[in-house]
Structures are given as structure tokens and as C-alpha cells.
Amino acid sequence: KAYAFNVKREGYLFYSDNFSLIDNKIDSSLIVNIPLQPIETGASIILKNIFFDVNKFQLKQESLTELDKVVLMLNENPAIRIQISGHTDNVGKDADNTALSLNRAKAVMGYLLSKNIDPKRISSKGFGATMPVASNESESGKALNRRTELAVTSD
């Protein structure tokens, strides 16, 4: 079964993650090091509980809890501005990946705007497969590269 969790502390970007207990025994412990970052220009997080179907940019229902955490953070910190960045793995054409990543970032931005966040506070950008965080040689690496990031910006 899949689980998600969020950690929040005043003055810091929230942290979220997801995990499965399929490969773990019931009696084993799960220990997680949680790196919280101060809310300041340049700080960024991967929104690990944002989900899309393959080659689609419509947000899956499971993403809304995470997005509501972003809305709460923005409401609690009215002076910050953010950029939402979409990223893909390297499967497919570069132009298609760039368009998909931009459309996914815009979908996230659209949800935030629907929750009355000032559009001047949010921007979106699609990077396609140009900024991998892992090797695209394995399925697990590709999964890490398919991500949505939130970065605090100065303008």
C-alpha cells in the first residue's frame, strides 16, 4: 500500500514524500531524514506527491492534498513568490517533453490560481529532460527525473 506524508515548520518550506510498504515487513521501522529549508529566495523542493498519467498533464486526484499544502504555505507567507517547474525523463522527442513539462507546471499553477493565489506570485516553466537529477538508464532514475519542483523566487 502507498502512503504519503508531509512535515511543516513555521518559516520553512514544507517537506513531503511517499513510500510503499509492499517490500517492507510489518515489524520493520522506516526512518526518514527530513531536510527542511528556510523560506528564502533560491530555496526549492520537489513536490513528491504530484501525480500525472503517462504523457498527460491533467492533475490526478491524489495530487490535491499536496497542492493544498502549497496553497496554505503561500497564504501563510504572503510576501513570497514561487516558480513551478516541470521536468520529464528522456523518453520521447525533446520538443514533446518540453511541452509536456510546461503543461504540467501550468496545471499546477492553474490549481493554485483556482484557490485565489495572486497570479503575480506564481510563474511556471517546463524544462523537459534537460535537468535530470538521476540517470535515465534505469526505471527508478527515470521516475526521479519525472518531477514537479517549487522554487522561491525574488520577482
Where on the chain are the PLM-derived regions?
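A short, solvent-exposed beta-strand micro-motif common in secreted/extracellular proteins
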Residues: 1-11
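Envelope-exposed proteins and targeting segments
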Residues: 3, 30-32, 46-48, 55, ...
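A structural detector for beta-sheet-dominated domains
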Residues: 8, 20-22, 35-37, 48, ...
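Structured interaction patches on ligand/partner-binding surfaces of diverse proteins
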Residues: 10-32
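Surface-exposed coil/turn segments at beta-strand junctions on protein surfaces, enriched
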Residues: 25-27, 40, 75, 143
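Short, solvent-exposed beta-strand/turn patches at coil↔beta or beta↔helix junctions
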Residues: 39-80, 85-99
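Periplasmic OmpA-like peptidoglycan-binding domain that tethers envelope proteins to the cell wall
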Residues: 77, 83-155
